[in-house]
Regions:
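Active-site microenvironment of metallo-dependent hydrolases
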Residues: 1-10, 16-37, 41-43, 105-109, ...
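Histidine-rich, glycine-flanked metal-binding segment
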Residues: 29-71
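Metal-associated gating/positioning segment near the N- to mid-region
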Residues: 69-140, 156-163, 225, 249, ...
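Active-site gating loops and adjacent loop-to-helix segments of metal-dependent hydrolytic enzymes
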Residues: 83-100, 109-112, 156-175, 210-223, ...
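Histidine/acidic-residue-rich catalytic or RNA/ligand-binding cores of hydrolases
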Residues: 86-89, 158, 212-214, 251-257, ...
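Divalent metal-dependent hydrolysis catalytic cores, especially in the metallo-beta-lactamase
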Residues: 104-129, 142-152, 199-212, 240, ...
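Alpha-helix-loop-beta-strand connector modules within alpha/beta enzyme cores
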Residues: 134, 138-152, 217-243, 284-288
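His/Asp/Glu-enriched, well-ordered alpha-helical/loop segment
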Residues: 236, 301, 305-306, 314-398
Length: 421
């Protein structure tokens, strides 16, 4: 009888609901912080109850977070898991896909420990992010929930053409399946390949880029017909479309086509902003990456010479563009371009958003509810509400008083499971 009783006690412990006490929490929806509450998380990993005051912890798996600020799990809409940008001196001449996969596992764990429970991987060398997403979902690795585009789409010589910088005899001419497309027909083939691969969305590089080996960082690289084809094909498969764009003309073509988000947006002009507002297009600014590359451009030989002037110009401009877009009313979702700068420093984006004019609460919502809306999952994630998936983090200090405390994530729960305490 004692043995049977012990088994029931053990099973009861395994199925215990979780109770969190918080003296201050930000729910991702309200315009103000709330105080003195009990959050109950059910065995299904969802928020079961949010009660005023403090429920007795008896019978619960209990976490006392009254010395911290509690928030919804954070979301970063622009990451590249699988390595970080290195100087010319440090950079290996070749990184095999297998090594990239190993680095991606490390980066995913680092990102989760920073409080980011959901990320959007936009651009991959192969199948790394798709495989990592599945491995995390199965439980083989620890990391954030991943939504990924797989390989980016580019035109010949464009920002994401993986044969750039190689002699013609050193590569096989890239096919649409590899991500290099020219004309609507090839666009359809590439989108369908992403569907076959198991991607969640599409990422296109509609203009030049900073780190690619080309002189221009902002020229348009997709025709209107090509961008229209991307969006039409993506909608057929239920994909979102994220667009790398620095130059205004390229991003305007993308916005008119009906894409979901503009990434970077460095040289966005007033017309582009008005189009984004009219079309409900999100802006994912990645100020952190701009600041990082501008800083590194001052170091001799850090970048190839063709990259250096582009890097020097982009940093200050992205911050200025972000501030103007926010004041104008463009919808903004949090994104860092982590992988250009080190993983685990995603929190710095909050500091830059504040620096360039966005209030703390708005910045926190940009990384919770607004990101969830961009992904189309705001009915499941993005806020602390009953029935939502229990992605919960806590920081030491109050980010509404000092946004830099977002670097001090002390507690991480994803789908009701505690990963950091």
């Amino acid at each position: 009888m004692k043995k049977i009783l012990s088994i029931f006690i053990f099973l009861g412990f395994l199925n215990a609901e979780t109770l969190i006490h918080t003296s201050i929490y930000i729910d991702g929806v309200s315009d103000f912080a709330k105080k003195n509450a009990s959050i109950v998380v059910g065995d299904d990993g969802k928020i079961k109850q949010i009660a005023n005051g403090y429920i007795s912890p008896d019978g619960y798996d209990y976490y006392d977070l009254r010395d911290y600020t509690v928030l919804p799990g954070l979301m970063d809409m622009h990451v590249h898991l699988g390595g970080e940008y290195q100087s010319k001196a440090e950079r290996p001449t070749k990184v095999e896909n297998e090594m990239e996969a190993i680095m991606a596992v490390k980066d995913a764990y680092t990102t989760l420990m920073g409080g980011f429970t959901t990320v959007r991987q936009v651009g991959d060398a192969g199948m790394t992010a798709i495989s990592l997403r599945d491995a995390i979902n199965i439980g083989y690795a620890k990391g954030p929930r991943i939504f990924t585009s797989g390989k980016s789409l580019a035109t010949t010589g464009g920002h994401a053409d993986h044969t750039n910088g190689k002699a013609q005899g050193d590569y096989v001419y890239p096919e649409p399946e590899s991500g290099v497309v020219n004309g609507p027909y090839e666009v359809y083939a590439a989108v369908r390949q992403r569907y076959k691969d198991g991607a969640d969305g599409i990422k296109i590089t509609v203009t030049g880029g900073v780190l690619s080996l080309a002189k221009s960082g902002d020229n348009p690289q997709f025709t209107q017909d090509e961008v229209d084809a991307v969006v039409t094909a993506a909608k057929d498969y239920g994909f979102w479309v994220a667009v790398h764009a620095h130059g205004a003309e390229g991003m305007k073509r993308a916005i008119k086509a009906g894409v979901d988000s503009i990434e970077h947006g460095t040289y966005m002009d007033d017309e582009a902003m008005e189009l984004m507002i009219a079309n409900g297009t999100y802006y994912v600014p990645t100020i952190s990456a701009g600041e990082f590359v501008a800083e590194k451009s001052e170091i001799d030989n850090f970048f190839p010479e063709v990259v250096r002037p582009k890097a020097a110009a982009v940093g200050p401009q992205i911050g200025s563009t972000f501030g103007k877009a926010y004041k104008k009313g463009v919808k903004i979702a949090f994104g860092t371009d982590a992988g250009v700068q080190p993983h685990g420093t995603n929190w710095k984006e909050f500091v830059y958003m504040k620096q360039y004019g966005m209030p703390e609460m708005t910045a926190l919502k940009a990384a919770t509810m607004e990101t969830a809306k961009l992904l189309g999952i705001s009915d499941k994630l993005g806020s602390l509400e009953v029935g939502k998936i229990a992605d919960i983090v806590a920081v030491k200090g109050n980010p509404l008083d000092d946004i830099s405390v977002m670097k001090d994530v002390m507690f991480v729960m994803k789908e009701g499971k505690v990963y950091k305490n």
